[in-house]
Curated annotation (Swiss-Prot):
GO terms for biological process: branched-chain amino acid catabolic process; response to nutrient. Its cofactor is thiamine diphosphate. Its EC number is 1.2.4.4. Residues 1-40 form a transit peptide. The lineage of its organism: Eukaryota, Fungi, Dikarya, Ascomycota, Pezizomycotina. InterPro entries: THDP-binding (IPR029061), Transketo_C/PFOR_II (IPR009014), Transketolase-like_Pyr-bd (IPR005475), Transketolase_C (IPR033248). This is 2-oxoisovalerate dehydrogenase subunit beta, mitochondrial. It comes from the Eukaryota. K(+) binds at residues 194, 196-197. It comes from Chaetomium thermophilum (strain DSM 1495 / CBS 144.50 / IMI 039719). It catalyses: N(6)-[(R)-lipoyl]-L-lysyl-[protein] + 3-methyl-2-oxobutanoate + H(+) = N(6)-[(R)-S(8)-2-methylpropanoyldihydrolipoyl]-L-lysyl-[protein] + CO2.
Length: 469
């Protein structure tokens, strides 16, 4: 039997409406000014985003065996050993394999973990150590966390993987009211979830949008009883993850997913730990302290090099590594020396890690009296991560740094024309004063349009405090 085809044609009335609508939109578009038409654009305005990061040459990674083994935090037995070139996910895989080999109480599980995981961090672990120690779970974060807490309470050392940090929220009740409080509830002689480690990828990648690019680390820093760790590279990832697994406190290890393949360095092949709760001074300076963690450190380093070259500003860069509990002593000592501090992170600015660091600095009398300028928080907008404009929702170090300094010619609507060297002295201050009003209006205008190109981590406060205070 032959099948008949029914063709539905639009009525004359519908066609008339469509033509009228198109005519109206065309007339409306032609009546708009070029500035108004930008509201309808699907493309963000031209902006000088962050200076390009060359992961192959950045000083934040150990590109040679000598550099990797010269780390003073490594034990002597490791410093006399060998290294292997690894990216971040390979270093995590190596740490997990080491933990499984050394301790039979270690279990690893999560969604697609037996398969190797979305980012391949658990590749071949199930084949090597067996499906009873490395296995998949149903798609239930609350169930994953509950199982992990129960296993830890029975003396195991479970490593639970949450596929994306964005997915952890159904498990939040388990983390807050069970994992973190177990020890307080049962007392010193009771059981605890101290052997628990939770891994999760976090941060933006350029196309993750609302449910795959969030940075919720500050939420975990409000939970007494947890340790929260964010590595910046493979050497750190291996050492900090092993320390977390061996720790007797429940730990949350948040891994910047954009670094899984981008960050590559020489990693010691033997087992080692890096200290939890201890920051690392990546670069010493005398004019201002920049405190950050994870992927934004690379953007900071690129911008700081440019700032030092153009203006002679000496910047001290600190990697927190553990954001809760964080290393107050290292940060305070640095700020007492420089008199200025900027805290940088990708997560939204409100109630973030930057707020805690800034408050702690001004609450410490010995540090506060040495401040030459207010502590600056430089972070993300308090908005969901957009898909099309995600790169503009991530930290833009260079653009806003140069703009706020008055180093860029500006269009009438506040967009940068070009970047140039700027004279110092009275002319510099005069131009800076004139441009500041334009830039403030530009920022408000950009925010209203939803084109958030003046985003996030910026080093304007660094240079302003150095030149103007």
């Amino acid at each position: 039997m032959k099948r008949s085809t029914v063709v539905i044609r639009p009525s004359a009335r519908a066609l008339s409406r469509q033509a009228s609508s198109q005519s109206f939109l065309l007339a409306r578009s032609s009546a708009l000014t070029s500035r108004q038409r930008r509201l309808y654009s699907t493309h963000p305005p031209n902006a000088r985003l962050n200076l390009p990061i060359d992961y192959a040459t950045t000083p934040l990674l150990a590109h040679t065996s000598q550099a990797a083994l010269s780390n003073p935090e490594l034990p002597a037995s490791v410093r006399n050993g060998t290294t292997k070139r690894m990216n971040l996910f390979q270093a995590i895989n190596d740490a997990l394999s080491t933990a499984l080999a050394e301790d039979e109480s270690v279990l690893i599980f999560g969604e697609d973990v037996a398969f190797g995981g979305v980012f391949r961090c658990t590749t071949k672990l199930a084949e090597t150590y067996g499906g009873d120690r490395v296995f998949n779970t149903p798609l239930t974060e609350q169930g994953i966390m509950g199982f992990a807490i129960g296993a830890a309470a029975e003396g195991m050392r479970p490593v639970a993987e949450i596929q994306f940090a964005d997915y952890v929220f159904p498990a939040f009740d388990q983390l807050v009211n069970e994992a973190a409080k177990f020890r307080y509830r049962d007392g010193a002689g009771g059981r605890s979830a101290g052997g628990l480690t939770v891994r999760m990828p976090c941060g933006g990648v350029g196309h993750g949008a609302l449910y795959h690019s969030q940075s919720p680390e500050a939420l975990f820093t409000h939970i007494p009883g947890l340790k929260v760790i964010i590595p910046r590279g493979p050497v750190q990832a291996k050492g900090l993850l092993l320390a977390a697994i061996r720790s007797n406190d429940p730990c949350v290890v948040m891994e910047p997913k954009i670094l899984y393949r981008a960050a590559v360095e020489q990693v010691p092949t033997t087992a080692y730990e890096l200290p939890l709760g201890k920051a690392e001074i990546l670069k010493e300076g005398k004019d201002v302290t920049v405190v950050s963690y994870g992927q934004p450190l690379y953007k900071c380093m690129a911008a700081l090099k440019a700032a030092e070259q153009d203006f002679g500003v000496s910047v001290e860069l600190i990697d927190l590594r553990t954001i809760y509990p964080w290393d107050k002593e290292t940060v305070f000592n640095s700020v007492r020396k420089t008199g200025r501090c900027v805290v940088v992170h990708e997560a939204m600015v409100n109630a973030g890690v930057g707020a805690e660091v800034a408050a702690a600095i001004q609450e410490d009398p010995e540090t506060f009296v040495r401040l030459e300028a207010p502590v600056a928080r430089i972070a993300g907008w308090s908005i969901p991560t957009p898909l099309v404009f995600e790169q503009f929702n991530l930290p833009d170090v260079t653009s806003k740094c140069y703009l706020t300094l008055g180093l860029a010619d500006v269009y009438a609507d506040g967009m940068p024309r070009d970047i140039r060297r700027h004279q110092k002295g009275d002319e510099f201050l005069r131009d800076l004063s004139m441009n500041s009003g334009i830039l403030k209006q530009s920022m408000l205008h950009s925010s209203r349009r939803g084109v958030d190109w003046l985003m996030g981590i910026v080093l304007d406060d660094i240079i302003l405090s150095v030149f103007l205070v």
